[in-house]
Amino acid sequence: MTSVEIVDALVDPTEAGALIQQSFDYTPSGRMPDLVSKQVEQRIEIEKIVYLIGLVEPPRYYILARDQDKLVGFGIVSESNLQYFYDLTWVCVDKNYRHQGLGKRITSKAVDFAATKDRNIIITTDAPEFYTELGFTTSAEFRTGWYLMLSPTLKEKL
């Protein structure tokens, strides 16, 4: 059984980098667009530096899905620039573990965690259907095909 846990610690970006690249590898040719590929590579390099020197920008919480000792999915919850919100980024699942509900479990854990801190989750995504199924609502739609979405806990407070 794959376990999902929340940890306040750094994740080895080399281990996480492979999952990030798999998650953005969604073109019909099986390759990331070059611009996205470069952005992902740069972000992974930044994460490696942060990991190696122990520097953490705003507080981050990692939601990890492991199959025994193997990292098979994760999400990162971090302080948002908006008061009362956490950003949820890099929800990634190993391609061999997809369609088992891990992405939903990771996202639900993030929403539950934010609620314990009296916060809401805000995400920017190109997969709004996935988050709508979990109760998120669209706050804005951008011409680029990306959406800004809010967690279900916010609706309950309005």
Named regions from a protein language model:
Residues 93, 99-112:
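Conserved acetyl-CoA-binding loop-helix of GNAT-fold acetyltransferases
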Residues 66-68, 150-152:
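Active-site beta-strand termini and strand-to-loop segments that position acidic
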Residues 20, 24-62, 66:
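Active-site rim helix/loop that mediates acceptor-substrate recognition in acyltransferases
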Residues 119-121, 125-146:
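Conserved active-site alpha-helix within GNAT-family acetyltransferase domains
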Residues 2-21, 28-31:
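A short beta-loop-alpha structural element at the N-terminal edge
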Residues 62-64, 70-79, 85-92:
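Conserved beta-strand in the GNAT
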